[in-house]
């Protein structure tokens, strides 16, 4: 691969910039695990396909893709991730006996630091025929090593925000030279942005692989802890995944909801439990009385606020709720997962900021499966209306299931693309 002199010089400089940075990173608590592997001192075994998943969410997608590929073809797979949480998910959900018969289980490793000399040694050791990058895993040292090795590069389930594109375009010539062979983006907008960044790559769209992972809730589950804490006939409103930047408007929402929906019980779920102390102060200053979830043994009184301080109970709260607001959306934070309430028959209400979930599609609003409020006041009106109307939960679940089912198939599409670069594919085995 012939590189322009400017890129060669920048690569040399980039490699040396890492020298003073590495000792600092070694002390970073999030990078301590697997640090020798990150340095390339513990090399993975060779693999035909290398799949990189940034963290926990992408780790599940990587597992699904690896399973599907190994069912279709006898190939060796390396799964890598940046985070300890991602590594734990990969190991937990892919035990030794999980691979198809006569297949070598995928190897799991931490993704190397992007120092070009480290990446070159790791790519030489692994020798992948196909590199799969999930969503937006774009690292110059990594891409350069892959290009020099002759490996085919695929970016699947691709997402690229306008803000990220602006940052990458500071040096458009670099990314044009390092572009993947093919990009499958999750929306036309993402595809257009990738085409701007990688004008020589093959760009198309695919269903988001995340739809393939969605499953209906267990209908045989027993009553949830949330249901046991509610007084009879009191409407229960969940405010889920509330972020730091939207605490004050959320407190205003709570006051307005208690005034608008008499007897309502509010379940307040901060996104980070480290904000519980701040919430105690905010609620006290607003003159609102609250109870900690961990201190409750019996049902609360009507009109109570439950400040949730336990992990793992948000889904059960949706099951018991009449209405739900999903945070990360009143401030420009990109939103949080609003799909889970739908699976329990609740049409979620969110604020105006949900860029991180636009991949779900604008049709989710058009089909009445998501209510988007312009501000916290409108969110209060929508939540109060949801409590008053008491729509059919079974109908919402069915509509949500149909919406999701119509958008499945991303994993299959991604697998087709990987196998296309490994060998000629008999397309009849995949169907139309």
Predicted regions mapped to residue ranges:
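A transmembrane-helix-recognition feature enriched in membrane-embedded lipid enzymes
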Residues: 2-36
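C-terminal amphipathic helix plus adjacent low-complexity
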Residues: 4, 22, 255, 391-432
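Active-site and donor-binding regions of nucleotide-sugar-utilizing enzymes
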Residues: 25-42, 46-220, 238, 242-244, ...
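Donor-nucleotide binding loops and adjacent catalytic segments primarily
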Residues: 68, 73-74, 80-83, 87-89, ...
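Short acidic active-site motifs
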Residues: 118, 142, 275, 313, ...
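Acidic donor-binding loop of glycosyltransferase active sites
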Residues: 126-130, 301-333
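Conserved sugar-transfer catalytic core signal across GT-A, GT-B, and GT-C glycosyltransferases
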Residues: 142, 246, 313, 336-337, ...
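Catalytic binding pocket for nucleotide-activated donors in carbohydrate/polymer assembly enzymes
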Residues: 180, 319-402
